[in-house]
Amino acid sequence: MAQQTFTGRKRVRKFFGHIKEVAEMPNLIEVQKASYDQFLMVDEPTGGRPDEGLQAVFRSVFPISDFSGTSMLEFVRYEFEPPKYDVDECRQRGMTFAAPLKVTLRLIVFDIDEETGAKSVKDIKEQDVYMGDIPLMTMNGTFIVNGTERVIVSQMHRSPGVFFDHDKGKTHSSGKLLFAARVIPYRGSWLDIEFDAKDIVFARIDRRRKIPVTSLMFALGLDGEQILSTFYKKLIYKRIKEGWRVPFDANRFRGYSTVNDLIDADTGKVVLEAGKKLTVRTARQLQEKGLKALRMSDEELLGNYIAEDLVNPKTGEIYAEAGEEITDKLFKVLNEQGYKDLPLLDIDHVNVGPYIRNTLSADKNMTREDALFDIYRVMRPGEPPTLDSAQAMFQSLFFDAERYDLSAVGRVKMNMRLELDAPDTQRTLRKEDILAVIKTLVDLRDGKGEIDDIDHLGNRRVRSVGELMENQYRIGLLRMERAIKERMSSVDIDTVMPQDLINAKPAAAAVREFFGSSQLSQFMDQTNPLSEITHKRRLSALGPGGLTRERAGFEVRDVHPTHYGRICPIETPEGPNIGLINSLATFARVNKYGFVETPYRKVRDGRVTDEVVYLSAMEEGRYRVAQANVPLDAKGRFTEDLVVCRHAGEVVPMTPDKVDYMDVSPKQLVSVAAALIPFLENDDANRALMGSNMQRQAVPLVRAEAPFVGTGMEGVVARDSGAAIAARRSGVVDQIDATRVVIRATEDLDPTKSGVDIYRLMKFQRSNQSTCINQRPLVKVGDIVKKGDIIADGPSTDLGELALGRNVLVAFMPWNGYNFEDSILLSERIVKEDVFTSIHIEEFEVMARDTKLGPEEITRDIPNVSEEALKNLDEAGIVYIGAEVRAGDILVGKITPKGESPMTPEEKLLRAIFGEKASDVRDTSLRVPPGVQGTIVEVRVFNRHGVDKDERALAIEREEIERLAKDRDDEQAILDRNVYSRLADMLDGRQGISGPKGFKKDTKITRAVLDEYPKSQWWLFASANDKLMAEIEAMRKQYDESKKGLEQRFLDKVEKLQRGDELPPGVMKMVKVFVAVKRKIQPGDKMAGRHGNKGVVSKIVPIEDMPFLEDGTHADIVLNPLGVPSRMNVGQILETHLGWACAGLGKRIAQTVDAYLSKQDVKPLKETLKRIYGEDETIKSLNDNELLELGHNLSRGVPIATPVFDGAKEADIEEMLKLAGMDASGQSTVYDGRTGDPFDRKVTVGYIYMLKLHHLVDDKIHARSIGPYSLVTQQPLGGKAQFGGQRFGEMEVWALEAYGAAYTLQEMLTVKSDDVAGRTKVYEAIVRGDDTFEAGIPESFNVLVKEMRSLGLNVDLHNSKLGPAPTSEAAE
């Protein structure tokens, strides 16, 4: 699996996977990008946009007509204007990265003929209207909102459609199953149809009061007889001599208990004696023998139901209504009237129950009007119904496209479930749909069919960014529609333009609200590249229209068989959100209906092909799917007789010819984070969950190092997350420095585009989590790169591979109790060599506002501050870049005017003599908060429009303009070089018919001739070849345009820089200061491996005290072996052994590299590499210099890839250990660093990839001397953010009581907490140097007294000796 890429040649991973991967892994952030592109459709031509996304929203809301119908506002098209600021400018200025939306609307005014009412068009006006800004997505699938990066998480919700379910016997004490159906639209009213305990069928609309389902059918326009004929077959019983001739049907009579003998109506023979039960088998035998009909007596027909009204044709008298039960009385009438045929309903109480018939007879409503009134009263209680209003309301509930939308998904699901064939453009319900739902529900009650599993992924779908945004924008437009309608009626429609009717605020507000405060719009987790990718691939069941934590039961959270290959069964948070927030599996994608699909290889006649098909959960249920690790022969046929397959949620062995599909890869069932854990298959699931979650918390280290033991996914993550920069086009590196890479393109040379790609690198930027984003180039000038090659590493990436931690030498052994309970013992080398050192960038900002008493000022001139404290500030009062600051230092000097206090005459005199002194301002400077110390890396100054810039702001601006000018000049130089070299190639060797001054006509143009003239004059040369001249002319035109474009872009950017900034109201100036903090690892920091093996650093030990190996190498980390057996994450042990082998092989390679350097012989290096890698294509293609560089890169350790579920086996690890010349047990003799004696037993030693997590002790440790108090109780606040105190709770009080420490206890509950007067006295006593104090009444006691008084209980305090004690009021 060698990648022939620029970085792939510098470090080759040995690949242990056996299964070839056929499917390309989709781009990992495609979910976000594709969805939003489909919503905006920026690149689609404005005329031919399909009806989806934003286009669909406008189409659904427009046209808008006024109330009288005299005018109409139509939507024509929309387009986006270019965004005002680019991504980086938005980040810096705290703006939203958005593009203005311009919509073309057409206002049509009609003339209405008063007599005929005919409409004719009187006037048409078209105009472009601004409809607010729509946020744009960045290249990496995020949004910049108010300067911060946010991610819109996709939401899992119940798919629209129809669902059948039962109450699992919980409602009724007998445990009887009550079935229910629910029709869920995308938007609109829900319709529930349910059975009650008496088997009557009811309907509910929007969870309101229930009504009999027959009332709903009446409202749909059916009458009683039609209802019965819809749900029941009609049987005609004929009158014969001894009774009735009844048609015989085996299915209908199975399970029939006979009262009298069963007699064949045609022959008169007895076919079954009385008192016996007709079994299914007997019934079938009778039918096969030719039994056509049975003879039954009158009494055997009692209890059946009439199928249609029995009416006397002459008089019109009704003897019996449809659905009436047959009684003796009715028989008398029938016999009197001489009925020969009797139509009965086919209800046998076994296969067909009388539920609808019973509901009909229980229903009080008899007509459509009654039913409509009843529904109206349920929906709008308290309003008197009229027939029109009731009809209109019922119509609008389910049949009006404006209010009810099943969506294409809902329609498709409904068609599948009910076996209908309505087109997916039919978005409202139809009469047939409702009847089909009731029919299916009744069938379920009769024991036919299955209920739905609502946790099946075929019944849950994903709403991605585009769709969430679409719904939000629709809400905004609907709010706008009301306002437009009212305005159309109130203005003179003939004189207005569309612009005057529209106020875009509601639409813009809906968008802003969604991005700013929706539960699904989240602050991006930017700790490292993996956490970014995982955040974008997250699926949440929470959010508006989703579940809530409290209500979600166990079933929703559980892993479902349909999750296979779609949703990761491992990666989900621990705690209350477990199972509600999931991650998309590696190969999964979301289809156009919002269902998650996973790829499979097609199997034809027992042979696996390379054709890849994506299937959703519903489709997959129909097929048999084999695992990816089933053994195949060279032709792709199954080698085993039985293949284990998944089919309809079960695992069954099948013969190869029955298999339909096969998995594409073993890692398709896990998410990206879980696929990064080597030997995942050897870890317990709970620990794998912790492992995949903790990788997302790994802090980017100062020196990233890719893992020795990887899984082959590292490169994919680094590339797709956008942390590492990939080349957009193939080309040659032209220029390079720390902040940018300039590549001259050699492919995709479009004459309309620049031939130069400039890649700007991010240097020491702050991420959302305050970690450091820093990119560094990997290429040198003159390197040839292909499209897609990695040219720069980002945070946590190393040679284009994800590198979250470091490879460290670990020994598994106890060490003086310092690794008790998962603690971690570290060597001092780790601190000294900055192995786990990370840089964190803190941002501090200060604003100078305009206050009532005058403007605040940012200045160096601060009252009562020593010159020493100002040493880091420049003349503008802002700290220098590069200054070292610590807690309490001033970053930005600021003074605020304070209110005039009355002055004494002496003060007035002094004031008059010495002029205005600083007594009327107070110091409100920005200082470094406690616990922070570091170096200033960046300062940004923002000024309001029209406010004069200070010296510092001007200096920053000058620097920025210089940078822009350099970019422009470089691009210009490369452009010139490119164009003039192409021009010289074109002219070289041609016959010149004219040229610049001094050129002789008809002379041959050569390079030498060209060099005599300045390049700008080369355009004057002309040749007789017209085609050539046309090409040159086109090139010149393109060149001039490019030049102009470059200059224009430069001027635009400079203009933006010099223009003032948009600051919040009342703010005159804002300064942001960025402090870089270097955090070395220290006791209290949390570390973890990739297998959920986490712990806290307990002690850092001098190198010489650490256990060491026979060759004198000291261990870097000592872990407790007891952390492995009970946790069952054996993967870490296998990783240790394999890492040990990698390091050993690295040493071997280092020796051969040294041999090459001393003897110039490359053979030993080639042979060693061949022994390790076998026949590797990449290594074969390298020249000697490249081999040497590869050797250098491999000398610390040979990186290997062991993919999940398809990785190295035990035998492979032993073989690697042998190859490295190590003991195959993976254990070594270890010596005690303090005594030098060997330990009794051999110890497992090897390399593990350890991460430093974001839970750093520096961020958590905190101490308070004095600080803020809570307003009511006057107790200190809590928490580091509030600079709070430590809570002395109930149990701590018990502890002091138990020890009888009365005075300590009193002090804790009074002066150290909320005895206001006592606190002040203690302070005064300390100032005097006195150490006595007296405790008073705690403020919380006064609060209690007040509460009791509010309940009407007066409380007075009395001191037993001195009478009433003063309470707080008395004191006041």
UniProtKB/Swiss-Prot annotation:
Domain of life: Bacteria
Family, as annotated: Belongs to the RNA polymerase beta chain family.
Keyword Transcription: yes
Gene name for this UniProt entry: rpoB
Entry EC number(s): 2.7.7.6
InterPro entries per UniProt: DNA-dir_RNA_pol_bsu_ext_1_sf, DNA-dir_RNA_pol_bsu_external_1, DNA-dir_RNA_pol_su2, DNA-dir_RNAP_su2_dom, DNA-dir_RNAP_su2_hyb_sf, RNA_pol_bsu_bac, RNA_pol_bsu_CS, RNA_pol_bsu_protrusion
Protein name, as recorded: DNA-directed RNA polymerase subunit beta
Subunit field text: The RNAP catalytic core consists of 2 alpha, 1 beta, 1 beta' and 1 omega subunit. When a sigma factor is associated with the core the holoenzyme is formed, which can initiate transcription.
Top EC category: transferase
Catalytically driven reaction(s): RNA(n) + a ribonucleoside 5'-triphosphate = RNA(n+1) + diphosphate
Record's function text: DNA-dependent RNA polymerase catalyzes the transcription of DNA into RNA using the four ribonucleoside triphosphates as substrates.
Any single Pfam family the record assigns to this protein: RNA_pol_Rpb2_2
Keyword Nucleotidyltransferase included in the entry's annotation: yes
Keywords: DNA-directed RNA polymerase, Nucleotidyltransferase, Transcription, Transferase
Organism: Bradyrhizobium sp. (strain BTAi1 / ATCC BAA-1182)
Record-linked PANTHER family: DNA-DIRECTED RNA POLYMERASE I SUBUNIT 2
GO terms classed as biological process: DNA-templated transcription
GO cellular component, one term: DNA-directed RNA polymerase complex
PROSITE patterns in the record: RNA_POL_BETA
GO terms for MF: DNA binding; DNA-directed RNA polymerase activity; ribonucleoside binding
